[in-house]
Design a protein with these regions (language model features):
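Short acidic linear motifs
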Residues: 14-459
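Classical Sec-dependent N-terminal signal peptides that target proteins to the secretory pathway
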Residues: 1-18
Length: 459
């Protein structure tokens, strides 16, 4: 949508004969800016996260009021034909920016960049990460103490606001809608994951698992189907799940594995992870569809300036709707891919062509989350094999019995058991679709990659 916006703002006008045709009702709904629905300001985790770093206890009401004022100011200022520039929007929407300075912010305190420098189990297949965490337990616990207020704030947000509904500023201001401080979520998670290992190592297994379960439920909240997430939210959830999965994999390789496997709450944790596995794919599809439709918010002033005809826009909407419907059913079907390639062939309007060629569906967001889910499922399968003591010779049949849980949705290839390496793997994965933590350990070359986890020898 950002690329489309810049292209539209930068192009000069040209004349297209307007047909005497009405806009499709669905198109009119998409392109018409609307006043803010104030009901969406209530009990909304998006607003809570947006204001989570505001230091005062009334952070939610303050943020809600500021967002509403900025939205209303932009809405009232929207011209019929021309578009507001980013400079004009910044001069109009002032209330949220004021919050950064008037009362101060809750900021992540890590002056020595411990979390950034010490990747710990954030590094893919680091066989020593559990020991490294235990060696650094005093630094980890100090980090938690220094950030106690910020951590409590985010705990409160997810406890009090289970549902998120992303709100965008109207029309061209949509690309300038402020977003939550996602880096805080990641930093807090990394510190709490490391502390869960410390707790388990100290014999406080209940507390360690409770921390892990809290984080898994937090991720699950971010991919609930009953909410309207933006695409960034969904991708952040996938990144958080990858980190958690790597910690679980490391714990299953550690000296604490048997104790965890016998703990009922650890079983509850692993089952909670399957809620994420069931929801991440459809949630990503919904977010992609919403992101794709956001491109239409730009087209009302373009229609008014006669740079685009009603016929062209109606036809383009129908084509994109066909594509989106196929993606919702089976995005990896050859028919869908063929339609993607052919969608732009009959599109002649320059503005529509730019949006068509930069389709959000082709960037790889869905593939990244599906590959992450593959890794997540591998860790879950590893847990099941260890929990139920599946014998090596029975593992191939066990994997087959798990159905889609052991099949990559992109290639439809099954996971493979290698008895010599004691690994479950998936080969032929594109580097660009791997989670960021895994890409760090693999060379970016033309060769397809192998995703895998290793089953330790019998406990």
């Amino acid at each position: 949508i950002i690329c489309t916006a810049l292209i539209i703002l930068g192009l000069t006008s040209f004349s297209v004969a307007e047909e005497q045709v009405e806009l499709l009702p669905e198109v009119k709904e998409l392109i018409t800016p609307k006043p803010l629905d104030t009901k969406l300001l209530e009990n909304n985790r998006f607003i809570a996260l947006l204001g989570a770093t505001y230091a005062k206890d009334d952070y939610y009401n303050v943020t809600k009021t500021a967002f509403a004022k900025d939205y209303a100011a932009i809405y009232e200022a929207l011209p019929e034909v021309n578009m507001l520039s980013s400079e004009e929007i910044n001069q109009i929407a002032l209330e949220l920016n004021k919050l950064d300075y008037s009362k101060g912010l809750l900021q992540w305190q890590d002056p020595k960049n411990f979390i950034k420098i010490n990747l710990l189990c954030f590094e893919y297949n680091n066989s020593h990460c559990i020991d490294q965490i235990i060696q650094n337990q005093s630094k980890i616990q100090q980090l938690l103490k220094d950030n106690e207020t910020l951590i409590q704030r985010y705990d409160d947000v997810f406890r009090d606001y289970p549902i998120a509904h992303t709100l965008f500023f109207p029309r061209e201001a949509s690309i300038m809608t402020p977003l939550p401080a996602y880096q805080n979520l990641l930093s807090i998670m990394k510190a709490q994951l490391a502390n869960s290992v410390v707790l388990i190592s100290e014999g406080k297994v209940d507390q360690g698992i409770e921390t892990l379960l809290l984080l898994q439920r937090r991720i699950n909240q971010m991919v609930y189907l009953e909410q309207k997430n933006n695409l960034i939210d969904v991708m952040i959830a996938g990144a958080m799940q990858q980190i958690l999965d790597q910690y679980l994999d490391a714990l299953l390789n550690s000296q604490y594995a048997e104790q965890l496997l016998q703990h009922p709450e650890f079983s509850a944790l692993m089952l909670a992870g399957q809620d994420y596995a069931k929801q991440i794919h459809p949630t990503t599809l919904i977010a992609l569809k919403h992101e794709s439709q956001l491109a239409f918010v730009w087209f009302k002033p373009v229609l008014a300036s006669h740079d685009l005809s009603v016929v062209e826009l109606n036809d383009y909407y129908v084509k994109k709707s066909e594509l989106e419907a196929l993606y919702q059913v089976n995005p990896y079907d050859p028919t869908t891919q063929k339609l993607v390639r052919e969608l732009c062939k009959d599109v002649t309007n320059t503005l529509l062509m730019m949006d068509c060629r930069n389709s959000i569906w082709e960037v790889g967001y869905l593939e990244r989350n599906d590959i992450q889910r593959d890794y997540h499922n591998m860790v879950y399968l590893k847990y099941l094999i260890m929990k139920h003591q599946v014998q090596d010779e029975d593992i191939p049949e066990f994997l087959k019995s798990q159905g889609d849980l052991a099949i990559d949705p992109i290639s439809q290839q099954p996971f493979v058991w290698n008895s010599k390496e004691r690994s479950i793997s998936l080969s032929g994965v594109q580097y660009k679709h791997l989670p960021a933590t895994i890409r760090r350990t693999m060379q970016n070359d033309a060769h397809l990659k192998t995703l895998q986890i290793v089953i330790p020898n019998k406990l």
